[in-house]
Amino acid sequence: MGRTSRIGSVLFSCIALAVGVTAPPAAATPNAGPGQVSAPQVTWGSCQRFLGDAARDIPTAQCTTVPVPISETDPTGPQAQLAVIKIPATGQRIGALFVNPGGPGASAVDSAAGMSYALAGSPMAEHFDIVGFDPRGVGYSTPAVRCRTDAEFDAWRRNPMVDYSPAGVAAIEQINRGYAKECADKMGAAFLAGVGTDSAAKDMDTVRRVLGDDQINYLGFSYGTELGTAYLEKFPDRVRAMVLDGAIDPAQDTVASILQQMTGFQVVFNDYAADCAKSAGCPLGTDPAHWVDRYHQLVDPLVTKPGPTSDPRGLGYQDALTGTFNALYTPQYWKFLTSGLLGLARQTDAGDLLMLADEYDGRNPYGHYSNGQDAFNAVRCVDSPTPIDPAVWADIDKRTRELAPFQAYGQFTGFAPRDLCAFWPVPPTSAPHPALPAPPGSVVVVSTTHDPATPYEAGVNLARELAAPLITFDGTQHTAVFNGNECIDSAIVNYFVDLTVPGNLTC
């Protein structure tokens, strides 16, 4: 899923686990011809080390780790180990289909395993190895970016962080500085400098060489479109077919991206409220003019007093907004948002909003967090320059209050905290720039008209920059491929299997 760096309440979770990098592997690598780079030598085996007992449900799956140097300038130095899963094609193999679910920070190993279920019996499973690799710092790859303990993350979530007075802003920025320092102390600056999309694109080509394929097929969702675009830019001749769904426009800077994303979330909040209003007892009522006000009447009191839940933690303000954002990614979650808001209205049980927040933040029922939010922060902070002028962030706050009033607490004060990336210990390794035109037929872009996290216009822009066809899905959700729409799915399957490039299409 594409995550939002929400203004006003930093949605960046933290977990602490001191992790070291591994020593370089002693095994020799296969010989390479003149001018070629050797592929690392790996051994494929059981996926239980990544998937646990779930590996038994995919008996043909094979897993391995692929070593890559932490520093490009020190290829024989410390290595990261990339977790890789491969579910072999069931019939005549065309090649490998790399999948990336987005984030950044979501596990592609988990995504590929799940996609193997969804595509079972389809031409995609018949002709392609389904492959997922976790970029460095992410998921099952090691070292995994982890910055705070579970208890520290729980405590962070209890802080509403809505005081935008000068003193309140200074306190929030101190929290952001502390988080950045913890990440640097636990992971090291050298490792953090190499976790961005630029490195991930090069690592994906290393995995391609391990698989022995001349070209890749690629399906990227949300942030996965950014990774795919970066790979296409670096290795255009190594792409057979690529689909980018839920596009991120690489030409957008941080400010433009925030403003566009907040606009998208307000549009979908309105879609949710309109759908909710069709049912008797909708907690937001039936008058569109009052939906935002009613939402604030329900959630703003949580700043000073948590809402009731069966979980002893209760529902804090930050969790209520996080849960709301999570629900807006898909209409399938709207019923949980309604249930949580009804719990606040009736002062009974708002636990469904807490459940949505836990899922978004990667907290399991036992109170342990995945490293998804830490990886999300580590990647985004090096992928693009972050404004450091406080006046820029005050202006962003003013504009997002106008564009997305549902998520804005209180009144504009003229002050706002700088994002934690403004305090990141290493500089960015990439900068916004338009995507380069792609080789004809090598890429297709898919964009959804009411996508909150990756708004439709970003897909239009990316398709234009790549000189690629655009498939438009007329709907309200985040991403669309292999999500039950026959119009889209048949076009995508024909493209991957037969290289039948669709024209511009609306489904």
Briefly describe each language-model feature range.
Residues 32-319, 378, 384-507:
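Gly/Pro-rich cap/lid or specificity-loop segments adjacent to the active site
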Residues 279, 344-353, 485:
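Short, solvent-exposed helix-helix connector turns and helix-capping sites enriched
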Residues 248-266, 338-341, 349-365:
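Flexible "cap/lid" loop of the alpha/beta hydrolase fold
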Residues 1-29, 204:
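Secretory targeting and sorting signals
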Residues 328-346, 386-391:
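Short helix-capping/linker segments at secondary-structure and domain boundaries
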Residues 305-321, 329-333, 366-374:
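Structural motif
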